[in-house]
Amino acid sequence: MTMRKRIAFLAGAISFDNQNRVLGGVLKRASELDMDVYVFTCFVNYDESEENKVGAFRIMDLQEFDLFDGVICMKNSIQYEPAVNSLIARIKKSKVPAVSVDEKVDGMYNVGISDYSSQKDIVEHLIETHDLKKINYVCGILQGKEGRERYNAYRDAMEEHGIPVCDNQIYHGNYNRESGRKAVEQFMKYNMPQAIVCANDAMAIGAMERLQQNGYRIPEDVIVTGFDNDELSEFFVPSLTTVDRRQELLGKNAVNLLFERSDDVNVQIDTKTIYRESCGCNMQPAMEIKDLRMEYQNKCLIYEEALDSLKCMELDLTGLENIDELCEKMKKYVVGSDMQSFYMCLCDKNEMFAYKSVCDHFTEKVSIALVYQNGKFCSDVDFLSKVI
């Protein structure tokens, strides 16, 4: 019997829509090829403390890449340099075929888009079609390729049209919705711009929320644009002008690159700029459609609140030194959720407590310290970490 091929997929936080859509493309193509995908991810924001990042990104140390037939890595999504450097070094050492999504990495295949030209198209649209001059920008993490290229595109488009940019027109965000809200609060301290261009959709939606809360109309008073074409961008009221990165196609092409062995090690996917209501284009006045979109928007916000609650749980559990206390606290969260089953894995208890300070690696043996199935908690189980 022929063994199914195995792909390791590595991403910083698939709770973000853009990462989740790439994964969706990987899963769909792998299913068509009768392959298995093993997902290694965590739930971490870009502004986490050093301690939380160290713990969260340890999952990236679990893989033995020699056991896989290929690796797909979303390098830019892992916003913690020590983890990224270690991960890339281990992938290269394994000699297993690997694809980097978005950012190019020496020795690996690459599939990505032109962040620069896509962002520049939006800024030029605002200048040339809407005749705007005061355009502020909410940038992402400038250490990453996406954030850097999108920011440079904004600055270049403004400069090429002879429009000066002041420091107070720039807000340095970290891709989450709260960054968009805080950006608007900063901009409100000065004269409000005609438009706010955001480096991703989450920040754009946060900006629109805060603008609406303060009585600003979009696009009549302030135009807002995003980037990524997240699911909510189409249904938010008003719908968001954005760039469709075609993430699912990125994922499918990543799988193809692994196993088709093309001579072209770099594949660039064409993006599509989608002009919607938030910039004054393609207005949709039908009230019944607006009501449906508002209903969907509210459901998405409830989902976001659930993710925030999960984050609070993680912070509540961080730093506990007693495993029994950890299990008891965890039980309250599990029972209060809709989960049908839950497994909490911990390093070997005896070895873990032999360390005077923080244990910086996974122990060889791992214990499932908490098991929840069919409404009941069960006894724990030990196994080797490498078989995860």
Q: What do these predicted ranges mean?
A:
Residues C345-I388:
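GAF sensory domains
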